[in-house]
Amino acid sequence: MMSITEIVDQIQHLLPNGKFSQDKHLIITGGEPLLGWQRAYPALLREIYDREMNLTHLTFETNGTQQLDSKFKDVLNQYAENNGLEVTFSISAKLPASGEKWESAILPKIVSDYLEIHGHRSYFKFVVSTDLDVVDAHRAVAEYQSAGVGIPVYLMPVGGVNSVYELNERQVADYCRNNGFRFSPRIQVPLYKNEWAT
């Protein structure tokens, strides 16, 4: 396993001039990046800020099922308030088509906790391909909203390869237009054919 120093060395190597620029985001994805790693992120942020890498945007791609540790919340709020760090939770809650049980996947109390981070820019992203998926997305949004979670909602077409993606891209765009959702393309599919490291 890489050390925090080695991870930040690698991040710095990938950045122009070793710094975040032009609103570049540090996006932490997974698996589930909030599962078991919350204790490591304060050291990661400290190392990035100690190196003066100009980080202003941090995004966690999460399924919205992991409670934030209180110490980690405090650290995120400190960086948000003292350093202007914009924290985003891209919440891709799993709908029944993914095989997840509703009561395990749609957890408004946990997501509402994410929204306590100072100046957060969070949103939902539901991966859909059928009318039933859209019905489930509506149901999930209603459940979150009834718990006070009112954040933007994106729909993203299913498909890691062009042949599948092209089948439902237009359909999902139409769902968005007709239902007031935002459309999120899988830009890596048409551009890079979802090749490794894209």
Predicted regions and their residues:
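Conserved alpha-helical substructure of the radical SAM core
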Residues: 1-27
